[in-house]
Amino acid sequence: MSNVFKIKFLYLILFKTIFSVKLDSNKVNEVLLAQHNKYRKMHNAPDLVLDNELIKLALDYAAALAYKSDAYSTYPSGTKNKNRERLGENIFSCISVLKNKPCYDITSTKPVDEWYKEINNYNFEQPGFTIDSSHFTQIVWKETTKVGCGAALKDDDEKTYKVVCYYYKAGNILNPEKFKANVIEHSYKQRIIMNYFSLVLILFYLF
């Protein structure tokens, strides 16, 4: 790690709490965990559980991003846990235009809902990584077992909100077979297709 990076990183850690406010991580994680698991059930993925290490990492990064919008370049890419295992990551940002109308609050499921909307960009018939569906695929990635989220606010005139979620095991492994095994088509859609073919078979035998 270069001396320049160390200085930038230490400066960010020392002063971020002055310029950004970490929001209640217990409430944030309670809400976002429930919404993650709601969507995962729809894709036959097991429920996630909260992880304190991931929560701390996410909260620190959210505070850094809220304080300094170019913190992406300050933090090293490919965040890892204490065992040096790569983590998945989703980031949500919004800026309140009106002072009395915040774009986000800690009881909101908006970050996960916005990430999940990327399902519309994913082609289940050709499984694989695309940048415009990567938030969605991480949410429903079947092998992922843990999540931890953090939210922070830059309390200035614009009120910049940042929400970060980290995941273990990381999703979005660049292998089509991994996507095929981990990103399962919406179970509701599957039931519609099965019911359609069942109806066709019934009609075939009747007539």
Locate each region found by the language model.
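Short, well-ordered surface patches within globular domains
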Residues: L23-R86
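Classical eukaryotic N-terminal signal peptides for Sec-dependent ER targeting/secretion
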Residues: M1-Y11, I192-F197
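N-terminal signal peptide
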Residues: I13-N26, F204-F207
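Second-shell loop/turn segments in exported
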Residues: K22-N26, M42-V49, N90-P102, H135
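Disulfide-stabilized extracellular recognition modules
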Residues: N81, L87, I95-R191, L203
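C-terminal single-pass membrane-anchor helix
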Residues: F197-F204
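Generic short amphipathic/hydrophobic targeting helices enriched at N-termini
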Residues: F9, L14-T17, K180, Y188-Q190
